Amino acid sequence: MNRDPLRDVVDAPLFIVPRVLERLRALRPALDGAALAEFERLRRCLLEGIERHPTRFWVLRQVQKAVEAVAGEDAESRQHLNTALKELLAIIGTDDGGVIP
């Protein structure tokens, strides 16, 4: 069984201001197929929930779900998604905590 990377994550509050939400709405990485669908699902989830759950752990749990959802895709698609996820986390103001391979 794989070790859960969130096990060692130190939770912290995130300061979500309108500018962060605007940048999340505007983020449109060059993805396709399952990677694009999963990125869009994650982006919607964050936009709908991050103000109620403004914590690093909650965000990383959502990102982890996206990473796991595309685990069966080809390496190039996964790499492009991982790059987009890191950009998304930079907008939010946190790192990946080891969730993104």
What spans do the regions from the language model cover?
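Residue-level signal for secondary-structure boundary elements
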Residues: 32, 54, 93-97
